């Protein structure tokens, strides 16, 4: 095991930049090798490094292990705080660095962030890293008994004095270790794996992604706030983490915080109980970027809404960026103060729709590739055709397929996929029917269901009928002729015209897009 790790470390040191090697590989340590099960366990000193190494380097380490032992090896990663103190195994000779395997990839990006952080730290060497907290802040940070902490990272001295941080990006020497990067992500609560590079883009989310990139490069200037809405599992959280990660790359030292709305509510309650609102406000009002997820959880919580309103006003006044996500359009969120709704509407509001077929296929293929599995296109198309709601559902289905294949020792095929997803496919087929779509659309537009089959052509009937045809094509497995038959025996070309017309207008008409979003969410329950 140790011989392999020396061999593996030496090769990775040649393949990676010195910064990448020191930050990600050197802190790892092999802890166990089970020859009977062909498993190798590698320890990482913290969760951040474990998640990053697992996502970025596990495939390469597994390849090297297979070459070394001449058999497939399953590489497992475990947490061990002492791993970072072990360093690289003795006897590993220094190697001349080569160009990184992925110079523009996420690992290189974090290395660049860490380098910028060192430059930022060296710009003010006399300032201490942290200052003692006030008594109320100490109460907020160090609680005992059943109470959890108010999740407010401490402010560096020069930030506490100035009220908010000044960005000081710039090149610098690589740090001796990844401690700065660890601290940066711990404070921001960002997931470094969620980047623009691994966000699968299609028609359903291309506007949201374009807006997110614009905001990431020009925070506080364009689209403030940026409000993203859509159903669960469509990529809202991925996008806002990607914005934060990109801003850290562009402007090292930016004060960023990702927080779920439920955690924000909890922090408000605890600050109220401990009379620690001064510290609470000082922290949230001094951010450069606030990313708040699922703001619909603020519904009915007046004190939380009041505190968020003050934070929002302070941040926008300071040209800090605010990004918000929700499961629905701002004006559709119940129990939210009108003045907050008006602030949400003052920026850019963008919907993220369920992924279209091609995008679903791309998501499945990329996820399978990240799992080291060669998924055939016919299997990917089969799954994508039957599962339409969101990315999480697709990824969950793929995990079921992979597990079923492994447990039964069979190659992945369409037949195996049907067996693995039998229950899921049955539920999907039972949930949405053309008849249900017709009734839902008729109720929504206040027309009779019989109008769906009739030959009437006034606009107030023809338009909902076209929308129902479009939804039938998108949400069921019916063919165009079958859909036409269910709409009063219409020709398949009529259905095709309706589908193309609504699909085209959806991308141009915000009101139509919103109505379709509401209908889709209603039909999917």
Swiss-Prot record:
InterPro entries: AAA+_ATPase (IPR003593), Chromosome_initiator_DnaA (IPR001957), Chromosome_initiator_DnaA-like (IPR020591), Chromosome_initiator_DnaA_CS (IPR018312), DnaA_C (IPR013159), DnaA_dom (IPR013317), DnaA_N_dom (IPR024633), DnaA_N_sf (IPR038454)
UniProtKB keywords: ATP-binding, Cytoplasm, DNA replication, DNA-binding, Lipid-binding, Nucleotide-binding
UniProt key word Nucleotide-binding: yes
Positions of the UniProt region annotated as Domain IV, binds dsDNA: 406-525
Pfam annotation, one family: Bac_DnaA
Region (Domain III, AAA+ region): 189-405
Principal cellular location given in the protein's record: cytoplasm
Spans annotated as Domain II: 71-188
Keyword DNA-binding among record annotations: yes
A GO CC term assigned to this protein in UniProt: plasma membrane
Subcellular location: Cytoplasm
SUPFAM superfamilies (alphabetical): P-loop containing nucleoside triphosphate hydrolases, TrpR-like
Region ranges (Domain I, interacts with DnaA modulators): 1-71
CDD domains: AAA, Bac_DnaA_C
GO biological process, one term: regulation of DNA replication
HAMAP family for the chain: DnaA_bact
Cited function: Plays an essential role in the initiation and regulation of chromosomal replication. ATP-DnaA binds to the origin of replication (oriC) to initiate formation of the DNA replication initiation complex once per cell cycle. Binds the DnaA box (a 9 base pair repeat at the origin) and separates the double-stranded (ds)DNA. Forms a right-handed helical filament on oriC DNA; dsDNA binds to the exterior of the filament while single-stranded (ss)DNA is stabiized in the filament's interior.
Domain notes: Domain I is involved in oligomerization and binding regulators, domain II is flexibile and of varying length in different bacteria, domain III forms the AAA+ region, while domain IV binds dsDNA.
Protein name, as recorded: Chromosomal replication initiator protein DnaA
Source species: Burkholderia vietnamiensis (strain G4 / LMG 22486)
Gene: dnaA
């Amino acid at each position: 095991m140790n011989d392999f790790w020396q061999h593996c470390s030496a090769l990775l040191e040649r393949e990676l930049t010195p910064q990448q090697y020191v930050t990600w590989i050197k802190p790892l340590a092999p802890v166990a090798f089970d020859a009977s099960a062909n498993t190798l366990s590698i320890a990482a000193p913290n969760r951040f490094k474990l998640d990053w190494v697992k996502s970025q380097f596990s495939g390469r380490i597994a390849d090297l292990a297979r070459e070394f032992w001449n058999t497939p090896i399953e590489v497992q990663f475990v947490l061990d705080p002492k791993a970072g103190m072990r360093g690289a195994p003795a006897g590993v000779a220094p190697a001349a660095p080569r160009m990184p395997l992925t110079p523009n990839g996420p690992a290189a990006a974090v290395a660049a962030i860490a380098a910028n952080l060192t430059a930022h730290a060296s710009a003010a060497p006399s300032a201490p890293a942290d200052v003692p907290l006030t008594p109320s802040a100490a109460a907020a940070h160090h609680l005992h008994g059943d109470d959890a902490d108010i999740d407010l990272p401490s402010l560096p001295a020069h930030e506490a004095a100035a009220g908010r941080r000044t960005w000081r990006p710039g090149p610098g020497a690589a740090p001796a270790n990844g401690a700065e990067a660890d601290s940066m992500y711990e404070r921001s609560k960002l997931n470094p794996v969620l980047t623009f590079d691994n966000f699968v883009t299609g028609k359903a989310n291309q506007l949201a992604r374009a807006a997110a990139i614009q905001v990431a490069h020009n925070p506080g200037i364009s689209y403030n706030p940026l409000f993203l809405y859509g159903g669960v599992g469509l990529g809202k959280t991925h996008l806002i983490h990607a914005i934060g990660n990109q801003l850290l790359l562009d402007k090292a030292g930016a004060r960023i915080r990702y927080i779920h709305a439920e955690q924000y509510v909890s922090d408000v309650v605890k600050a109220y109980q401990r009379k620690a609102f001064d510290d609470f406000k000082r922290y949230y009002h001094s951010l450069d970027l606030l990313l708040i997820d699922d703001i619909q959880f603020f519904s009915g919580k007046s004190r939380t809404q009041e505190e968020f309103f003050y934070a929002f006003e302070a941040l926008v006044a300071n040209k800090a960026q605010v990004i918000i996500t929700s499961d629905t359009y701002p004006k559709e969120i119940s129990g939210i103060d009108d003045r907050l709704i008006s602030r949400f509407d003052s920026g850019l509001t963008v919907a993220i729709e369920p992924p279209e077929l091609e995008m679903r296929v791309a998501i499945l293929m990329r996820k399978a590739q990240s799992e080291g599995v060669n998924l055939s296109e016919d299997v990917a198309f089969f799954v994508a055709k039957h599962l339409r709601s969101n990315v999480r559902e697709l990824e969950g289905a793929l995990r079921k397929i992979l597990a079923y294949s492994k447990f039964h020792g069979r190659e992945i095929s369409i037949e195996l996929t049907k067996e693995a997803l039998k229950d899921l496919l049955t539920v999907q087929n039972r949930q949405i029917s053309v008849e249900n779509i017709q009734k839902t659309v008729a109720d929504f537009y206040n027309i009779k269901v019989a109008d769906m089959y009739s030959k009437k052509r006034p606009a107030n009937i023809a338009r909902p009928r076209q929308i129902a045809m479009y939804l039938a094509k998108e949400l069921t497995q019916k063919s165009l002729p079958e859909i036409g038959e269910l709409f009063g025996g219409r020709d398949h070309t009529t259905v095709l015209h309706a589908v193309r017309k609504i699909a085209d207008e959806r991308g141009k008409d915000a009101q139509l897009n919103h109505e379709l979003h509401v209908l889709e969410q209603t039909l999917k329950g």
